[in-house]
């Protein structure tokens, strides 16, 4: 009675073993299929990649544009270099002649070539470091360059021609002659002749900062340089302002700022591109002193004078230059002006300015209302 049961149990065991073997075979087959598919995809990817890399250029990129060719030719490192002749760093005094030693192009073996080298335009008329740039183009169209450093040191003894700072006062119309007409008044037609002459003869009008650099031996100004200054304020030169604009001629108006109740009253003048407002002090253009013409400036304490000057700077919107009231000043006045932050101060003493002159005691060329154009030209040249 136990034998049939044992036979049934054996069949079941054999069936389970066959099922396990079958499952293992299926899993193994699945793994093999996945590996084959992965290998096939990798092969396709590599084939496409190699085919693309080795394919000839299409009609779109076969020739390329001229600009692209030029850019490709100029990219990368050239086999040629520019070699400076002489020192790569040179020092020269302002105003002294400078002769450039030049440069040549050499190939990778160090052989000199006949490739031409151009030197970019440079200006050594100011003190400081200047970079001289040399350029050339190699046979493949690549641009190569080199630089030489030229340091210009200050020099006050280079033989400057002299800078005229012209001193004008009042401008009037011949149809409305002032009752107190004197040599400080110039007729608007006479002034226009002078401005027209300056414009047509390409005169240069330096800023006060450039004037200071000129005095310190740090800048060479063009031979035809001039500064136009008008004392006492813009109210006295209303007729001149349109002429400054017409002939594109910059001018300075030295303003007595106490004449204006509010600094906004100076806005129309301050915003004019051809008119610069500078200080003629706030309230020191009056008597009360015992020095020179009796101006009050030399008689005031340093604190009082400084407060006055700082107020005038606030009103003018500039503090580069000062005109001494009545031309009166002392060494103490100069120190106060410098402490207030001014770059320059002008007097009424006659003459042109030269490098090395005291920046706080500058001479001026007086402009007379009776002068002819020829006299004007003679005075400034």
Model region roles, listed by residue range:
Residues 110-148:
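Serine/threonine-rich, repeat-prone extracellular segments and beta-strand-based repeat modules
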Residues 161-185, 222-226, 234-236, 240, ...:
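Metal-dependent polysaccharide deacetylase catalytic core of the NodB/CE4 family, i.e.
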Residues 196-204, 245-249, 314-317, 338-343, ...:
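Sec-exported extracytoplasmic/periplasmic mature domains
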Residues 230-235, 239, 342-351:
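Acidic, His- and aromatic-enriched active-site or binding-groove loops in soluble protein domains
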Residues 1-69, 337:
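Gram-positive cell-envelope targeting signals
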Residues 134, 223-225, 330-346:
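Short, electropositive alpha-helical surface patch
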Residues 58-63, 69-72, 131, 147-225, ...:
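N-terminal pre-catalytic segment of deacetylase/amide-hydrolase enzymes
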Residues 67, 72-110:
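Solvent-exposed, low-complexity, repeat-rich "mucin-like" stalks and linkers
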